[in-house]
Amino acid sequence: MARHPWGMERYERVRLTNPDKVLYPATGTTKAEVFDYYLSIAQVMVPHIAGRPVTRKRWPNGVAEEAFFEKQLASSAPSWLERGSITHKSGTTTYPIINTREGLAWVAQQASLEVHVPQWRFEDGDQGPATRIVFDLDPGEGVTMTQLCEIAHEVRALMTDLDLETYPLTSGSKGLHLYVPLAEPISSRGASVLARRVAQQLEQAMPKLVTATMTKSLRAGKVFLDWSQNNAAKTTIAPYSLRGRDHPTVAAPRTWDEIADPELRHLRFDEVLDRLDEYGDLLAPLDADAPIADKLTTYRSMRDASKTPEPVPKEIPKTGNNDKFVIQEHHARRLHYDLRLERDGVLVSFAVPKNLPETTAENRLAVHTEDHPIEYLAFHGSIPKGEYGAGDMVIWDSGSYETEKFRVPEELDNPDDSHGEIIVTLHGEKVDGRYALIQTKGKNWLAHRMKDQKNARPEDFAPMLATEGSVAKYKAKQWAFEGKWDGYRVIIDADHGQLQIRSRTGREVTGEYPQFKALAADLAEHHVVLDGEAVALDESGVPSFGQMQNRARSTRVEFWAFDILWLDGRSLLRAKYSDRRKILEALADGGGLIVPDQLPGDGPEAMEHVRKKRFEGVVAKKWDSTYQPGRRSSSWIKDKIWNTQEVVIGGWRQGEGGRSSGIGALVLGIPGPEGLQFVGRVGTGFTEKELSKLKDMLKPLHTDESPFNAPLPKVDARGVTFVRPELVGEVRYSERTSDGRLRQPSWRGLRPDKTPDEVVWE
């Protein structure tokens, strides 16, 4: 049987006490057996109680003693339990909401044998509509199980006439329960009215066997078809709940074939568990729209978004690139470090008391904790006293990682499990190396620094990327300042006279730059890998993106190097930027390699300098930063004079006047979580040659379907020819409007060095 997502929750925060206490004397059933039953049945039970206020009926001393109902959640209840409040005439009652296996474990620990819920769920903290109808078939004195089943089939027939499905249960007490899922939720009052009419209709059709009246004196020899439990204020024993009877019976889902069996009887908890492998959840369609637990369910249950600055997203996490990590210094009750690795839309998290080991000679404890949201990659702040994890948290390091092995058992904290293993190579500013996390037992893992594998091959290097920001507050003591050159980013691998040039995406582009052949001779005594920019210069010697787009043979194109990644068999990725810069300048001294001068002064002076020189902007680099291939790092900050944005072409409009035979404007978008977002049109900045070239390139990409995630505004949709979103360009613009459009965009050119999936808002 496939496991339901609810079954993946952990329960290490619930400690079972008095496991040997006998709760069912007639069978000797202990509290430990009850606890194990609820843990085992949670995968199918939780969807039918999720989102609903839970009333518990407790037998702390067993079913031979008195029981009591408990609605109000005690102040001592754990903070991670989800809550919901209902205001009654007598006041407000706060109920537990059991959305997880762990929550059901808490119910069992309290000896709450019976779980009762209404037929509605909370919605945004308030009482929502009924999602299902329930009929309780309560037998009067002398009524047999066969007669109950006869009435159940009659109810089913009436529901079928209404195009509604009906699901039967033996209640575990005396009667039967029938559940009817509602395709469209209705008010509890509406559900009660419908159920009452069905009951009254059967009472009229079968007056000797059915009554819809609550008066007990009228029930002898009849089945009371109880419709009243659909009232918003009433509850019903939950499917799969134990019953507080002499024997540990269960409100057990049954098949309709069983309801026709004259030998039908109530089932014990062990029998219900045995049936799971054969039948699965017979009620699965009943609550198919239940709020599905995801990997952040436990995380959310431990935090109140109104009380903590931590991110508490409501959305189900979406899978990302599985390549980011963060280490946070957490000044909680005890100082420790939290390692978080992006995986399948969440951050798999470990508390590491002494941080990751620095050498291969030592191992350190790492305690697995609940998955955290992706937003936690950037979280820092103070968690208030009284909240989970209270204390100050700062980002100690962050970066990217590569995976060799990532095995985290589904039952992460099973005390008998020791099969988890993670091997990753971390690329951060402080941590850079190969690490293993090995599960020793349950939630305890071991963190080990491994020997690094052979250095990455030069042909595998990807460019390090800068983060958008302002350099105004940066000082020259900590930061170096370079010009941001208006060209194409390239990686050059010069190996003793052999030259290879790759674009930012790794595409081989050696043939596109015949002007760089001389570098092979200039660097013939070395094997060197350089990072830099291919630039086309205008008449005044300033890099021009327009010239780069439309370069002719006579266009002056140069390679401007600004970093060195490899030299004669040695990787320089871990060297400080200051040391790499010295090596680069020494390599260029007296040769043909161009290394542009750094900019003078602090951040403001550097920006003023590039304004006067008409450069694109400034890139600030920390003197002590390492080179982090393929990662957008906060160690490099780019600050542009002009607003520029990479865009994806999603269509074009016919021109007018002199452009009537070609393109008048391009229709632009930026990829996002929901698809390609329309950001406007651009109709200026083109040369006639560019427009002709664009038309030829877009013609084979024609499509009848819009590539955008929403219909275009009417004024923009008129006369549009849609194309497949495969070409990337760049525009300059004045500002971004509140609805996500680019104001006054001007075309700068195509970006053949970029792919659509690389385009994001800058």
UniProtKB/Swiss-Prot annotation:
The active site is at K484. Binds 4 Mn(2+); 2 Mn(2+) for polymerase/primase activity, 1 each for 3-phosphoesterase and ligase. Its cofactor is Mn(2+). Keywords: ATP-binding, DNA damage, DNA recombination, DNA repair, DNA-binding, DNA-directed DNA polymerase, Exonuclease, Host-virus interaction, Hydrolase, Ligase, Manganese, Metal-binding, Multifunctional enzyme, Nuclease, Nucleotide-binding, Nucleotidyltransferase, Transferase. GO terms for biological process: DNA recombination; double-strand break repair via nonhomologous end joining. GO terms for molecular function: ATP binding; DNA binding; DNA ligase (ATP) activity; DNA-directed DNA polymerase activity; exonuclease activity; metal ion binding. SUPFAM superfamilies: DNA ligase/mRNA capping enzyme, catalytic domain, Nucleic acid-binding proteins. Mn(2+) 3 binds at H330, H336, D338. Its EC number is 6.5.1.1. It catalyses: ATP + (deoxyribonucleotide)n-3'-hydroxyl + 5'-phospho-(deoxyribonucleotide)m = (deoxyribonucleotide)n+m + AMP + diphosphate. Disruption phenotype: Not essential for growth in the absence of DNA damage. 320-fold reduction in NHEJ on blunt-ended DSB, with a loss of nucleotide insertions. 100-fold less efficient repair of 5'-overhang DSBs with little nucleotide insertion. Upon deletion, the fidelity of DNA repair depends on the form of the DSB; for blunt-ends fidelity is very low, for 5'-overhangs remains 50% faithful, for 3'-overhangs repair is fully faithful. NHEJ on blunt-ended plasmid is 24-fold further decreased in a triple ligC1-ligC2-ligD deletion. Residues 750-762 have a biased composition (Basic and acidic residues). Mn(2+) 1 binds at D136, D138. It holds the Pfam family DNA_ligase_A_C. Residues 296-453 are annotated as: 3'-phosphoesterase domain (PE). With Ku forms a non-homologous end joining (NHEJ) repair enzyme which repairs blunt-end and 5'-overhang DNA double strand breaks (DSB) with about 50% fidelity, and DSB with non-complementary 3' ends. Plays a partial role in NHEJ during 3'-overhang repair. NHEJ repairs DSB with blunt ends and 5' overhangs with a high level of nucleotide insertion/deletion, without a need for microhomology. Acts as a DNA ligase on singly nicked dsDNA, as a DNA-directed DNA polymerase on 5' overhangs, and adds non-templated nucleotides to 3' overhangs (terminal transferase). This is Multifunctional non-homologous end joining protein LigD. It comes from Mycolicibacterium smegmatis (strain ATCC 700084 / mc(2)155). The lineage of its organism: Bacteria, Bacillati, Actinomycetota, Actinomycetes, Mycobacteriales.
